[in-house]
C-alpha cells in the first residue's frame, strides 16, 4: 500500500512512476476523494468543537437558572448533522481506501520499462545450455523408464495439473527439500513449517488481494473463509502483522518449506506438460524484515544463496531483471533465476527475488522503533529458495544419460544413501 501523504505531496511524480507498471493508472479519482475526506474531517471537527462549546454554555446557563432551550435545539441540530457527516465520511474513506489498495508498488529507477516480459534484461549467465551426443528426452519421456512421477492416477482424483511423485521420485524430492532447508539454515535463516491456510486479511497484507481476488483456493470454515497459500511469503509476512520490532532486532530472516497452491496452472501449453506448470508444488521461501538501510544487503544475500544452490547443483542458469510489465504487484524490483530445461529448449524461472520496500508492511501494519523512539514501517523482501518442480525437471533433463538414467547431483547424494544414479527401469 502506498503512502497517501506522498501522493498528495507529489501527485504527478507518483503517477508517472506508477504508469511504468500500468499505463492506465490515474491518481485523479484518489486525489479528489482524498480532498473530500479531508474536508469532511475538517467539517466534522468544527462541528464537534461547536457542540462542546454549546454544551459548556448550556451547563453555565442552567446553573444561572436561565432558559437554554435554543442552545439545546442547536446542539440537537449539530448532532444530527454530525451523524450525517460521519456516515458520509465513512463511505468516502472506504471508497478512497478501496482505490489506494489497488495501486501497485512503485518500480525502482533501474527497472526496465516494458509492457511485458519481452523487456526483461538478462544481467548474468552461468554455464551454457546442456548439449548431448544423443537426442535429449523431455522429463515425461524419461519418466517412462524412471517411474518416479504419476499424472494419470492423481488426474482421476484431482484433475489435470495435480501430479504425484512416487517411489524414488519421492526420495529425490525430499532430498532436494532437505538440502534446500539446510542451505537456508547455514546462512542464518530461521526455519518454519507454517500453516497452509490463512485468513483473508493475511492475503490482503501480503498484497494478494483484492487485486487478484478469485485466483486462490478457498475453504469455508463456519462463517470464516480460509485460503490455501500461493506461497509461504503470505504467512511469513502475516506472522508479524500489527507488531512493532525494535530496530536492534532487525534484520530478521525466515525460511519456510510448504506446498503452494495456484489456480492459474491450467493455462499451460502443450510444451509445458508435466511438472513445468502445476497447481500444487513444494517451495522453500526466503523472507526478510529489515530497515530501509538493510534492504539492499538482504537482497544481495538472498540472491547469492540462490546462485550458490544452482552452482552446487551444477545447472546452467541465468539471472533476469524483470521489466515493469512482468514484475509483481507488490515488488519494487525483481530478479528471476532461470534454469535451462533441455526438454523445453528454454530457460524457466525457479526463483524470484523481490524487494517490496514498505508496501506490504503498510498493509500489514508492521513497524519498528528506532533508537530515538520514532516509528517506521519495516521493509520486506522475499525470494524462492527454491521452487522444486522445475528444479526437479532441470536435474532430470540436464543430467540424463543415453539409456534414460539420470546422474544424481553430488550435493544430493548424502540424502539418498550416497546413490549416484537413478537407473532406468525396463
UniProtKB/Swiss-Prot annotation:
Source species: Chlamydia felis (strain Fe/C-56) (Chlamydophila felis)
GO cellular component, one term: cytoplasm
Annotated GO MF terms: ATP binding; serine-tRNA ligase activity
Subcellular location: Cytoplasm
EC annotation from Swiss-Prot or TrEMBL: 6.1.1.11
Domain notes from UniProt: Consists of two distinct domains, a catalytic core and a N-terminal extension that is involved in tRNA binding.
Assembly and oligomerization: Homodimer. The tRNA molecule binds across the dimer.
Presence of the UniProt keyword Aminoacyl-tRNA synthetase in the record: yes
InterPro entries: aa-tRNA-synt_IIb (IPR002314), aa-tRNA-synth_II (IPR006195), aa-tRNA-synth_II/BPL/LPL (IPR045864), Ser-tRNA-ligase_type_1 (IPR002317), Ser-tRNA-synth_1_N (IPR015866), SerRS_1_N_sf (IPR042103), SerRS_core (IPR033729), tRNA-bd_arm (IPR010978)
PANTHER family: SERINE--TRNA LIGASE, SERYL-TRNA SYNTHETASE
Signal sequence segment: none
Family recorded in the similarity comment: Belongs to the class-II aminoacyl-tRNA synthetase family. Type-1 seryl-tRNA synthetase subfamily.
Name this protein carries in UniProt: Serine--tRNA ligase
Binding positions for ATP per the UniProt entry: 262-264, 278, 349-352
Alphabetic keyword roster: Aminoacyl-tRNA synthetase, ATP-binding, Cytoplasm, Ligase, Nucleotide-binding, Protein biosynthesis
